């Protein structure tokens, strides 16, 4: 992000897009580095139904926590972009089911998807 900002002209409006994997399953445990894991044990297999509720929640929560850290780092970088009017908008493309109603991930058709899959986070910083 810092490198991208340094290469931008301060005389023109610019938009940067950053694609993040965020809390995208089934491999939630791969979405946060080891030094950022707060909750253990984690589910480390793709068959989420074979994990305990605690393991699945821990892996997902660690991925959300790490996404929060990345977004905070981006905001700190944008705050330091002197001479630029900066803002950040974060939107997820879908929610995730973690076993609610026997569903996992986000593959149900929209018309029958539970709230966990269709209500998504959105964060704006200006």
Where are these regions (language model features)?
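Catalytic domains that recognize anionic headgroups
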Residues: 1-126
């Amino acid at each position: 992000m810092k490198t991208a900002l340094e290469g931008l002209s301060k005389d023109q409006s610019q938009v940067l897009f950053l694609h993040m994997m965020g809390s995208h399953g089934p491999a939630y445990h791969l979405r946060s580095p080891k030094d950022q894991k707060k909750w253990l044990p984690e589910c480390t297999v793709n068959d989420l139904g074979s994990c305990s509720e605690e393991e699945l929640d821990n892996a997902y929560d660690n991925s959300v926590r790490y996404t929060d850290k990345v977004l905070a780092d981006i905001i700190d970088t944008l705050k330091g972009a002197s001479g630029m009017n900066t803002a950040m908008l974060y939107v997820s493309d879908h929610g995730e089911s973690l076993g609610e109603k026997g569903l996992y991930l986000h593959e149900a058709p929209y018309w029958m998807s539970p709230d966990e899959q269709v209500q998504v986070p959105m964060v704006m910083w200006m």
